[in-house]
Amino acid sequence: MTGGGKSGGKASGSKNAQSRSSKAGLAFPVGRVHRLLRKGNYAQRVGAGAPVYLAAVLEYLAAEILELAGNAARDNKKTRIIPRHLQLAIRNDEELNKLLGHVTIAQGGVLPNIHQNLLPKKTGKTGKNASQEL
């Protein structure tokens, strides 16, 4: 038997192999974040906890934006999130707008806003007409 090992081709101890993402209870890939941190020349060394923490933060931000965008889509009676819904979600949330203030979203449009000076003047009805409107 050539090239054999007692584990049948699998690495030793891989019987119950578990990804770092599943260990941390995350959907975002911890291994990929770790690789990108190493390849990005941000520092000479990357600790073991840094990619887990960063993946958790990225997952939280994505979930927050998608939840608000889903609400915007539902308000517009749509079942699919489009860039317009992302734009509305981000710009209507104070903290996300501050974080992504200089980000341009393609096909996002602008927030509906009419300046106060352009609105028609409200004429206040006073006198006996106002008292008879009960």
Swiss-Prot record:
Q: Which UniProt keywords apply?
A: Acetylation, Chromosome, DNA damage, DNA repair, DNA-binding, Methylation, Nucleosome core, Nucleus, Phosphoprotein
> Localized where?
Nucleus; Chromosome
Q: Which GO terms describe its biological process?
A: DNA repair; heterochromatin formation
**One MF annotation (Gene Ontology) recorded for this entry:** DNA binding
GO CC term, one of those recorded? nucleus
Q: Where is this site: Not ubiquitinated?
A: K121
Name the InterPro entries on file: Histone-fold, Histone_H2A, Histone_H2A/H2B/H3, Histone_H2A_C, Histone_H2A_CS
- Coiled coil (UniProt feature): none
**Extent of Gly residues compositional bias:** 1-11
From the UniProt entry, list the residue stretches annotated as the region Disordered. 1-25
- UniProt xrefs under SMART domains: H2A
Give the highest taxon in the source lineage: Eukaryota
For this chain, the Swiss-Prot or TrEMBL PTM comment says: Phosphorylated to form H2AS128ph (gamma-H2A) in response to DNA double-strand breaks (DSBs) generated by exogenous genotoxic agents and by stalled replication forks. Phosphorylation is dependent on the DNA damage checkpoint kinases mec-1/ATR and tel-1/ATM, spreads on either side of a detected DSB site and may mark the surrounding chromatin for recruitment of proteins required for DNA damage signaling and repair. Gamma-H2A is removed from the DNA prior to the strand invasion-primer extension step of the repair process and subsequently dephosphorylated.
Positions carrying Phosphoserine are: S131
Where is the motif named [ST]-Q motif mapped on this chain? 131-132
* Signal sequence, renumbered to the chain: none
This protein's domain notes = The [ST]-Q motif constitutes a recognition sequence for kinases from the PI3/PI4-kinase family.
Q: What is this protein called?
A: Histone H2A
Q: Which gene encodes it?
A: hh2a
